[in-house]
Design a protein with these regions (language model features):
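Residues within well-ordered beta-strands of beta-sheet-rich folds
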Residues: 56, 136, 168, 450, ...
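Residue-level detector of short, conserved catalytic/binding motifs and their immediate flanks
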Residues: 51-53, 131, 165, 334-336, ...
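Sec-dependent signal peptide recognition
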Residues: 2-8
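Short, surface-exposed tryptophan/glycine-enriched loops
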Residues: 498-513
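Glycan-processing catalytic domains of CAZymes
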Residues: 19-411, 484, 511-514, 522, ...
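Order/disorder boundary and secretion-linked terminal/linker segments
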Residues: 397-492, 523-561
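Hydrophobic h-region of N-terminal signal peptides that target proteins for export
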Residues: 8-18
Length: 561
């Protein structure tokens, strides 16, 4: 099947058959490993015009050295007392190791230039409904090597009709000497000649840049951008945007008094270790000394730290932040800024290597430490898996609302269009000890999948970029989740193998064609394990991960709007 844009495909389908319905974000469902379900249109309410969600996105993996990886969580698993042992062989030489990892991402210790990873990130953002990526350039680097790979991928999906996130640079706060060179660089690289202008995040009619406006910029730069000042804590001036939510969440306002944005964060910044504590490593950091209370890490809620096993999987602190943002008194705020997707790294500062901070302990870990004291949403290997991603999906849905899902009447077809390109092989270096990451499991790539019901049977069809291969047990698998049935370990009640089209009698599923019903489904090709997380990594899946497509059938009334 030749590649078509989302819009052209849907137009062709509609012109050929007036009973064909394009799916939308409301036709996604699923649940995380904790049993928390993706909220539906009935729970979110209708679309809230003008509301958007931004996500802090990091470009720095491998850009400051590829030594390692040195994973603090794995070091502590090997020796629980390693934080108090500066001479432990588990520690690298801080003079030659600028960065440590707090944990392992699902896609491995990747470099930000890995396009295989970038495509998966973009797919996840499309499915979540993210509107803008804020690039963390607060340390004086803008990482052009990475954005030169990211922007063409975003543009490709945009040109095919997918709603991709826009981009915005978030520069250094005032105290870090936010100068003009970084702004000039991104101006010359991407803005001056209107390169990737489809992807600019617009605010007040101009591309937004978060940096200090009172610098000696060129007049053409001052005229081109809408400026907002950066800070990490509650702003004291108007036209200042922040991401930290400390010491308490608040709403940033413009100079005209208009409420503009609010922050939502996984945990407070500076969840770091600086000195021995009774709970070794669990929350002594700058924030404790500044705000005179325990660090509010992932498991903090109702004024205390939840110490139950796996408490860090639930995103308790994040949920409190989300609930605050969603309160009725903040319905007029148009933008929520979520911190964050993928920091993963922490500068390795010790008494030997540090020249920035007055240290109270031999090691200083600023902002990240381990699974509990970190703030990334991107799925990880083990640990919280993809729970924070699906929590983010739910927040976006509640913040922005949802359209009515596509509903099929008798004989109608619902089409679900897939973002292709993610089945290309992976062949890219990771951190030094990882060598080259490879993945050649992509075989049958889904272009779109369709479902119809004539009142007696369901017809599922998968169209692939190339003619499908159906030679393996894991080839062209269809998974169904039918209400009232007990799902298996993967989360499904029925499996079908090795075909691109399945006609399934409703009676086989216990469904009645005279009644309205809903079911969830997923297509998968060449998975490597019976693990829901494998749907993110190997082969192709429509949709990826724990998300499923939602098919809604109503014999009395299809969605013909």
């Amino acid at each position: 099947m030749r590649k078509m844009s989302v819009l052209s495909l849907v137009a062709a389908l509609l012109s050929a058959d007036a009973a064909t319905r394009p799916a939308n974000l409301a036709n996604l469902a699923g649940e995380d490993h904790l049993g928390r379900k993706i909220v539906s249109r009935a729970e979110t309410g209708p679309v809230k015009p003008g509301r958007q969600v931004g996500l802090f996105y990091y470009l720095w993996m491998g850009q400051h050295g590829t030594q390692g990886p040195y994973d603090i969580s794995k070091m502590e698993a090997a020796d629980p007392d390693v934080m108090d042992k500066p001479d432990s062989p588990l520690w690298p030489d801080s003079a030659h190791t600028p960065m440590l990892h707090w944990g392992e991402p699902l896609f491995g210790y990747y470099l930000s230039t890995d396009e295989w990873v970038i495509r998966r990130h973009v797919e996840m953002f499309i499915a979540a409904g993210i509107d803008v990526l804020y690039f963390d350039t607060t340390n004086g680097y803008h990482y052009r090597e990475v954005t030169d790979r990211l922007f063409p991928i975003l543009q490709e999906y945009h040109d095919r009709g997918f709603k991709v996130p826009k981009f915005c640079y978030y520069m250094a706060p005032n105290r870090r000497g936010s100068g003009t060179s970084n702004v000039l660089d991104v101006w010359l690289n991407y803005y001056k000649d209107r390169k990737f202008s489809d992807l600019y995040f617009m605010w007040d009619g101009k591309p937004l840049i978060v940096t200090h406006p009172d610098r000696p910029y060129r007049q053409e730069i001052l005229d081109f951008f809408t400026f907002r000042r950066p800070t990490w804590c509650t702003p004291s001036k108007p036209d200042t945007w922040y991401w930290g939510g400390m010491p308490t969440q608040n709403v940033a306002v413009a100079s005209n008094g208009r409420r503009e944005m609010l922050p939502v964060t996984v945990s407070t910044p500076h969840a770091a270790m600086e000195s021995p504590t009774p709970q070794r490593g669990r929350g002594i950091g700058a924030s404790e000394f500044r705000w005179r209370k325990d660090v509010q890490s992932r498991s903090w809620h109702h004024g205390r730290l939840d110490t139950r096993e796996n408490a860090s999987h639930y995103g308790f602190f994040l949920q409190e932040q989300m609930d605050w943002a969603l309160a009725p008194e903040r319905e007029d705020v148009p933008l929520a800024f979520v911190c964050q997707w993928n920091e993963w790294l922490v500068p390795f500062l010790t008494e030997k290597s540090n020249d920035l901070y007055k240290m109270r302990h031999w090691i200083h870990l600023m902002d990240e430490y381990n699974m509990e004291s970190s703030r990334d949403i991107e799925p990880m290997k083990g640990g919280f898996q993809d729970a924070y991603y699906l929590q983010l999906v739910n927040f976006v849905r509640r913040w922005k609302g949802l359209p009515d899902p596509a509903v099929a009447g008798k004989g109608d077809t619902v089409v679900f269009v897939e973002p292709t390109g993610d089945c290309a092989p992976r062949n890219h270096p990771g951190y030094d000890a990882c060598g080259v990451y490879t993945n050649f499991t992509g075989r049958n790539e889904f272009a779109d999948v369709c479902v119809s019901c004539d009142g007696t049977k369901l017809v599922f069809t998968a169209n692939t970029v190339k003619p499908p291969l159906c030679d393996r047990e894991t080839s062209m698998n269809l998974f169904l989740r039918v209400p009232g049935k007990e799902p298996d370990a993967l989360g499904y009640t029925h499996r079908y193998r090795r075909a691109a089209r399945y006609e399934i009698p409703l009676a086989d599923l216990g469904l009645d064609g005279a009644q309205r019903f809903e079911l969830q489904f997923k297509w998968s090709d060449n998975r490597q394990a019976d693990d829901p997380m494998d749907f993110y990594v190997n082969g192709d899946a429509a949709p990826r991960g724990r998300l499923n497509y939602l098919f809604v059938y109503d014999p009395q009334q299809g969605n013909r709007s």
